[in-house]
């Protein structure tokens, strides 16, 4: 298959708002791909690389200035092979070797192919063909139910692997996917709850009420002496968090998969700012730290060996596997019992089936301790990997949403010369496209204004005199007092008193909240 076929399909997907048309175009391309081409093609269409990170940052890529090829002759296999070579480069002279490989690739690429490669390698390839959309295309190409593809993907954590199985072996191959210790799965996500009282009533009081920590999500796998720690986005950070590895090694079990959060604490035992915890994740992967321009407030700090105060403390809230037994489909009550049996004091504090008054006091106590609020979880619900559902609800003193930045307006007054007023959007789960729900410049510090002005042009899709419009690639956490019906925006709702809390570099665009979630906050 020619690389140009992938580029043309990507452009066609970007050019239409019809989800049906997007899926059809992607499925047609997948059917045409050879077996060995499926993994890279699926990865690229999802805006990723089969090899993961390959050490090519923005400065390296923009330094490659080669005239484009006139004819489209590059093949998918050739591009993927060069990515393999780039991923293997290390040691002395690695910078020059990467430049040689990139120059070879760029020389063989046409202008549209060069543009695609630049956006792919800088993580800016967002075309509406996010993983959920590509998963639908895989199902269509393989003629299997999309739910089977989604479940297999949740368990494999890798859509290219899932696609290969679907197109080679159909439904039977997808049914073979199981939770595998050592292979991360997509984490279960929570939906915003209207209030503590309503969340408890919805589940008839059969709930676990837990502290909602302002930490970083982790998933820990142990199989005998082999231990791995993964982030929310399934990135392996094992080498950078030795204190977590040592703790898990001491647990009284043979095999276990744990879900939880980790955070840095002050000497008084209070949580440090989220950005400080995230800085440890950056140092857990120096290559990643070099490639990613993190928002202000996310400093790259020395590793734990030289910064004792930034030791990470884990708090586990779910057990997905224990000593040979998978627990994904077990109710939370059963998973919680297994969790307490294996991690003991390292389980997150919780009240089980509390009275409303006790839950309210617990809420106040969580806030006083410096936490974000509470999680209310149904004790009867299974672990819905990769999904954001009502069986987990997050309760905060003010509502927060994770939204996509769709654009920014040039500021005036003290903000003159800076990209300021943000255009905010939620995901439409039916089309995969963002839906604008409001604007805000509230909460933007001088440092964030400067960062936005430098960073946003990397994500630019268009501009006019007043506004720079962005591809929906950046996730920002927004606090709000509520939502209201509004004919001004296409989704029919608008945010009330929205303000920026922080950017979320730990979240991908398909983990942003949906327009349905926003509408669910209507009074």
From Swiss-Prot:
EC number(s) in its UniProt entry? Answer: 6.5.1.1
What PANTHER family does the entry give?
Answer: DNA LIGASE 1/3 FAMILY MEMBER, DNA LIGASE-RELATED
One of its GO biological process terms is: DNA biosynthetic process
Instruction: Give the annotated active site.
Output: 212 (n6-amp-lysine intermediate)
* CDD domains the UniProt entry points to: Adenylation_DNA_ligase_Arch_LigB (cd07901)
Q: Which family does it belong to?
A: Belongs to the ATP-dependent DNA ligase family.
Keywords, alphabetical: ATP-binding, Cell cycle, Cell division, DNA damage, DNA recombination, DNA repair, DNA replication, Ligase, Magnesium, Metal-binding, Nucleotide-binding
- tRNA-binding: present as a keyword of the record? no
Which gene codes for it? Answer: lig
PROSITE patterns in the record: DNA_LIGASE_A1, DNA_LIGASE_A3
Tree of life domain = Bacteria
Q: Has UniProt tagged this entry with the keyword ATP-binding? A: yes
Q: Name the residues that bind ATP.
A: 210, 217, 232, 261, 317, 388, 394
Q: Which cofactor does it need?
A: Mg(2+)
EC primary class = ligase
Name recorded for this polypeptide: Probable DNA ligase
Spell out the molecular function terms from Gene Ontology: ATP binding; DNA binding; DNA ligase (ATP) activity; metal ion binding
Write out the function statement from the record.
DNA ligase that seals nicks in double-stranded DNA during DNA replication, DNA recombination and DNA repair.
Q: Which SUPFAM superfamilies match?
A: ATP-dependent DNA ligase DNA-binding domain, DNA ligase/mRNA capping enzyme, catalytic domain, Nucleic acid-binding proteins
Q: Which reaction does it catalyse?
A: ATP + (deoxyribonucleotide)n-3'-hydroxyl + 5'-phospho-(deoxyribonucleotide)m = (deoxyribonucleotide)n+m + AMP + diphosphate
């Amino acid at each position: 298959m020619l690389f140009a076929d992938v580029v043309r399909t990507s452009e066609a997907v970007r050019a239409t708002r019809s989800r049906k048309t997007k899926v059809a175009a992607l499925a047609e391309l997948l059917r045409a791909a050879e077996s060995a081409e499926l993994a890279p093609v699926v990865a690229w269409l999802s805006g990723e690389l089969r090899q993961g990170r390959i050490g090519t940052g923005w400065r390296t890529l923009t330094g490659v200035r080669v005239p484009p090829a006139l004819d489209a002759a590059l093949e998918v296999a050739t591009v993927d092979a060069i990515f393999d070579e780039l991923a293997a480069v290390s040691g002395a002279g690695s910078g020059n070797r990467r430049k040689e490989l990139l120059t070879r690739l760029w020389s063989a690429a046409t202008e549209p192919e060069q543009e695609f490669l630049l956006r792919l390698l800088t993580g800016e390839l967002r075309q509406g063909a996010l993983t959920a959309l590509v998963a639908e295309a895989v199902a269509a190409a393989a003629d299997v139910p999309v739910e089977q593809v989604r479940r297999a993907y949740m368990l494999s954590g890798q859509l290219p692997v899932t696609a290969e199985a679907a197109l080679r072996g159909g439904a039977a191959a997808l049914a073979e996917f199981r939770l595998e210790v050592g292979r991360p799965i997509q984490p279960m996500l929570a939906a915003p709850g209207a209030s503590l009282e309503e969340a408890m009533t919805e589940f008839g009081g059969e709930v676990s009420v837990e502290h909602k920590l302002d930490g970083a999500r982790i998933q820990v796998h142990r199989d005998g002496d082999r231990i791995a720690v993964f982030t929310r986005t399934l990135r392996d950070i094992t080498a950078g968090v030795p204190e977590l590895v040592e703790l898990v090694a001491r647990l009284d079990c043979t095999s276990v998969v744990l879900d939880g959060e980790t955070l840095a604490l002050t000497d008084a035992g209070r949580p440090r700012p989220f950005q400080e915890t995230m800085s440890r994740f950056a140092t857990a992967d120096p290559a990643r730290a070099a490639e990613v321009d993190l928002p202000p407030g996310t400093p790259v700090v020395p590793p734990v060996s030289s910064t004792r105060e930034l030791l990470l403390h884990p708090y586990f809230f779910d057990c997905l596997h224990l000593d040979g037994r998978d627990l994904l489909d077990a109710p939370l009550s059963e998973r919680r019992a297994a969790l307490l049996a294996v991690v003991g004091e390292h389980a997150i504090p919780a009240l089980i089936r509390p009275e409303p008054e006790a839950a309210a006091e617990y809420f106040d106590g969580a806030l006083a301790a410096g936490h974000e609020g509470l999680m209310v979880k149904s004790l009867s619900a299974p672990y819905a990997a990769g999904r954001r559902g009502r069986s987990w609800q997050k309760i905060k003193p003010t509502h927060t949403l994770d939204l996509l930045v769709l654009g920014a307006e040039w500021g005036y007054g003290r903000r003159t010369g800076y990209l300021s007023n943000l255009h905010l959007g939620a995901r439409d789960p039916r089309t995969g496209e963002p839906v604008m729900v409001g604007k805000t410049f509230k909460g933007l510090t001088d440092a964030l204004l400067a960062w936005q002005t430098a960073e946003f042009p990397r994500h630019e899709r268009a501009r006019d005199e007043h506004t720079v419009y962005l591809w929906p690639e950046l996730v920002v956490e927004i606090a709000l007092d509520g939502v209201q019906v509004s004919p001004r925006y296409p989704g029919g709702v608008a945010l009330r008193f929205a303000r920026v809390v922080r950017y979320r570099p730990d979240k991908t665009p398909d983990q942003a909240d949906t327009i349905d979630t926003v509408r669910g906050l209507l009074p």
